[in-house]
From Swiss-Prot:
Subunit relationships: Heterodimer of LeuC and LeuD.
Reactions listed under catalytic activity: (2R,3S)-3-isopropylmalate = (2S)-2-isopropylmalate
Pathway: Amino-acid biosynthesis; L-leucine biosynthesis; L-leucine from 3-methyl-2-oxobutanoate: step 2/4
Required cofactor(s): [4Fe-4S] cluster
Cofactor note text: Binds 1 [4Fe-4S] cluster per subunit.
EC primary class: lyase
Positions annotated to bind [4Fe-4S] cluster: C351, C414, C417
Signal peptide range in chain numbering: none
CDD domains xref list: IPMI
Protein name: 3-isopropylmalate dehydratase large subunit
GO biological process, one term: L-leucine biosynthetic process
Length: 473
């Protein structure tokens, strides 16, 4: 019987299997940042161990890095704990070594899930881990990638392996072509809206179908990034020419004979025609409209042409209660049109949507509308995902488009995706955000988050409320 893409990668990395089915899995790439690594390095020191395979580590600072005040250097990091974590990462990597390290203030520094792929650290067929739940991003390359906890970070550093039980296989097939103006973010939000945030629990999801194949590598990264929000630990897309062309020539990619050998292997990284999946979900791409979350979970999402749901119409008591709690927190009334929801702040960035194509997508909307940020918008900020993205955007003049319209153009970092740095919402503030989580307090205590695509966020900044981006496509 044929094997799925997940089966192939998992099986080829099994070092040993216990009687209960637990596998010792070899890890090819370990991505490290400043938040989940300090305890791991300290644990190694206390045990008298060293990093087993230094060449597997690629490190950067991202969660705590400020997006302003870089001219002040490390003194620009206002929070002492944030500063300590960033300084500690510098010291730990200097002591242990790494295949590549992109420290705070360096040209290639950025969000770990942006700098990994752009530097060729993420390759097809790899097992990739990081102490961050959105490591699933790297599955876009046909790599088995998922987040791990701090104790597991130390385990991988010490042994280059991880204990894992094999997941079930789910195929999410998005058939046909999307309408103009529909993006990867809309696709993945529609998927989550269909299967729910627990739909992928216990599975690894392979994303397939014409609409997925049509996506660029950056679009595929957006989809795989949010596989975790569908309950899956990992998401995958089969390798094709787009994958190989993206990787070619990047700093950490193989070269010469090794490149040729790698490509030959990479071309086998797809599910066999007769592979069996434990679950199959299908979506019609033509039916996907611009998506906006209304509640406090990514599954609480609707099309821009819908209205806020009425809990009284929900028969399931637990679901009805969840809707009521979400509406109370979000300050929304049932029946309110989604395009009548006004926002206070706009955030374009995060490991979901901060790559150069996201910048172009948002800038194109701003340029087409030709107007300033709406007066009710307190802050509209654009945060590129890495120094290289920022540099490329500035070469293309995208920063000038944003700044002329009244957006703030920031330095790279995780920024307002999470309330771990200076960029955050105040209680009661409503944000159109291109990030991946709209949980209570995610962007700041009492903050209200609506997840959207970069184009939808840009349009909301100009209009002051959500609008149907298809009219500008």
């Amino acid at each position: 019987m044929g094997r799925t893409l997940y089966d192939k990668i998992f099986d080829e990395h099994v070092v040993h299997t216990e009687e209960d089915g637990t596998a010792v899995l070899y890890i090819d790439r370990h991505l490290v940042h400043e938040v989940t690594s300090p305890q791991a390095f300290e644990g190694l020191r206390e045990a008298g161990r060293k990093v087993w395979r230094v060449s597997s580590i690629v490190a950067t600072a991202d969660h705590n890095t400020p997006t302003t005040g870089w001219e002040r250097g490390y003194d620009g990091i206002a929070d002492p704990i944030s500063k300590e974590q960033i300084v500690t990462l510098d010291k730990n990597i200097q002591e242990s070594g790494a295949a590549a390290f992109f420290p705070f203030l360096s040209k290639r520094q950025g969000i770990v899930h942006v700098i990994g792929p752009e530097n060729g650290a993420t390759l097809p067929g790899m097992t990739v881990v990081c102490g961050d739940s959105h490591t699933s991003t790297h599955g876009a390359f046909g790599a088995l990638a998922h987040g791990i906890g701090t104790s597991e970070v130390e385990h991988v550093m010490a042994t280059q392996t991880l204990l894992a039980k094999k997941a079930k296989n789910m195929l999410v097939q998005v058939n046909g072509k999307v309408a103009p103006g529909i993006t990867a973010k809309d696709i993945v939000l529609a998927i989550i809206g269909k299967i729910g945030t627990a739909g992928g629990t216990g599975y690894t999801i392979e994303f397939a179908g014409e609409a997925i194949r049509d996506l660029s590598m950056e679009g595929r990264m957006t989809v795989c990034n949010m596989a975790i929000e569908a309950g899956a630990r990992a998401g995958l897309v089969a390798v094709d020419d787009k994958t190989i062309n993206y990787v070619k020539g990047r700093p950490l990619a193989p070269t010469g004979v090794e490149w040729d050998q790698a490509v030959a292997y990479w071309k086998t990284l797809h599910s066999d025609a007769d592979a069996k999946f434990d679950a199959v979900v299908e979506l019609n791409a033509a039916e996907i409209v611009p998506q906006v979350t209304w509640g406090t979970s990514p599954e609480m999402v609707l099309g821009i042409d819908a209205v806020v749901p009425d809990p009284d119409k929900e028969k399931d008591p637990s679901k009805r209660g969840a809707i009521e709690r979400a509406l109370t927190y979000m300050g929304l009334q049932p029946g309110k049109p989604m395009d009548d929801i006004f926002v206070d702040k706009v955030f374009i960035g995060s490991c979901t949507n901060s790559r150069i194509e996201d910048m172009r997508e948002a800038a194109a909307v701003v340029k087409k509308l030709g107007q300033k940020v709406a007066k009710n918008i307190k802050l509209a900020m654009v945060v590129p995902g890495s120094g290289l993205v920022k540099e490329q955007a500035e070469r293309e003049g995208l920063d000038a488009i944003f700044k002329a319209a009244g957006f703030e153009w920031r330095e790279p970092g995780c920024s307002m995706c999470l309330a771990m740095n200076a960029d955050r919402l105040e209680p009661g503030e409503r944000c159109a955000s291109t990030s991946n989580r709209n949980f209570e307090g995610r962007q700041g205590a009492g903050g209200r988050t609506h997840l959207v695509s970069p184009a939808m966020a840009a349009a909301a900044a100009i209009h002051g409320h959500f609008v149907d981006i298809r009219q500008f496509a």
